[in-house]
């Protein structure tokens, strides 16, 4: 049994004094090409004036804000929304992605900045024209839908039916014809957020045919045709986005620190504007999701390394030294505590010396089901000053603001040796069960310098209409440090997960509840966590014969009695597979699911199937639910993504 599958904790190499080994190449102290000709005062002026990274433009932030806002709104309406809620969502969608005369411009400019490539004028002009047309037809459709919903049933007639059918058909066909303009050969990656947003709107539109089609006068054959089209396009759009996201990411792999920063920014920003969105596409199928859906995104995103200087050329760590040691796929956990270690960094003049964050331990806990606290290996260099402990105990850290400082030593003739350090971090945290906000601070207490990092700049809130503790989009769940070249300091990197994650795996009494299997707290035998294929909202579980897992679910808080749920599992398998469902210590049901893919195939959207187990489950109080996998041959593989609980009326 492997209770935690925290394999990344086994890959960190430590020195005899328990410090992370610095086994990358050492750069000469004065070998900083962009700085060595500067005198000390000129360097200080340059670093003060140039302390904001070039890619943090207002356009990029605008695109990220739009992407996060759309996901936040969608999470509130996925499933089977009716009437006013749907029209209100569409109105917000129009105001978010199509507010002016240049629709989705921010998304195009975002990727141009990320991969340092421009979209050719002919392709951009055609895409922009198509987007303007889509905006117009969708706006007309939403206006007609609003009028339809507000018209009493007794006043709806054949003319009003014909009018809304006409506008729906115009909008749907316009989207279908326009999509190739956002997949122009050679520009697939550059157009990817634009493609994803257009695809999302098209699939939402097709969903409406299933909700309203009968009232609009469509025949059963028409509705079946629309539904088939929706399912086929969900596959096409999802696979396109996952494929070209990966192609763009692979192209950005490099060897230097600066290349890793760009690589990670692409990964983070494309997750926020593309991958999070396509994760929700299956939920638009209202024949499958006949109720509202409570779902969550368990994927990790990393904010930029925290440094006190913009230009790290020559003394940043290497691409591989960061990428090889960030967290590998893991069971979901939440932040319990951080132990901060500090050291003194002498300054050239003495008075410019400062204390800095030199290393840390991280303690985490599984989402629910186990009281075990898992302590990480030590990251960085052990403290020569007092250790500081901050405990969060599951409260959601929604913002981190860091201060930093620099020590610059002249070397040789005109050269410089730069030391960078994080000197103070203020963590804002929210207890959603008590509706309480508080802050905790790591403080090195000596020359803390100015603010060099605010997580909100890279992970903005869902909306600016509410206070930040209610509107935040992400919560901190891991921290680790990396050594700069030549012992020049430490760069911390924060890992965040989406606000939608429910630590308690709480079932909804009215909605369908999706729980990713990475929310389990026990893995059995050869069960392992592997990276998701890009459209699952996080990592997934890989099983072989005889493997399994256990997760804990919490009953709906509004229930004082038991509730019965149908169970579905989203899975991919290279052979027929037997799923066993256990409640506590007894076997509740055995189900056999079909093969979905061939051995050796890459996981795509159509590799997965959603199948129901043979018996419903009655939930009363907290329940441990075991899932076992069997009946497959040697070399066969089973991947499980989510379990769904569908309340029975």
From Swiss-Prot:
Gene3D superfamilies, per database record: Galactose-binding domain-like, Pesticidal crystal protein, central domain, Pesticidal crystal protein, N-terminal domain
Composition bias type Basic and acidic residues, residue spans: 1-13
Alphabetic keyword roster: Sporulation, Toxin, Virulence
InterPro entries for this protein: Galactose-bd-like_sf, Pest_crys, Pest_crys_dom-III, Pest_crys_dom_I, Pest_crys_N_sf, Pest_cryst_cen_dom_sf, Pest_cryst_dom_II
Region (Disordered): 1-29
Job description of the protein: Promotes colloidosmotic lysis by binding to the midgut epithelial cells of Coleoptera.
Protein family (similarity comment): Belongs to the delta endotoxin family.
Note, other: Toxic segment of the protein is located in the N-terminus.
This protein's name: Pesticidal crystal protein Cry3Ca
Organism for this UniProt entry: Bacillus thuringiensis subsp. kurstaki
Gene: cry3Ca
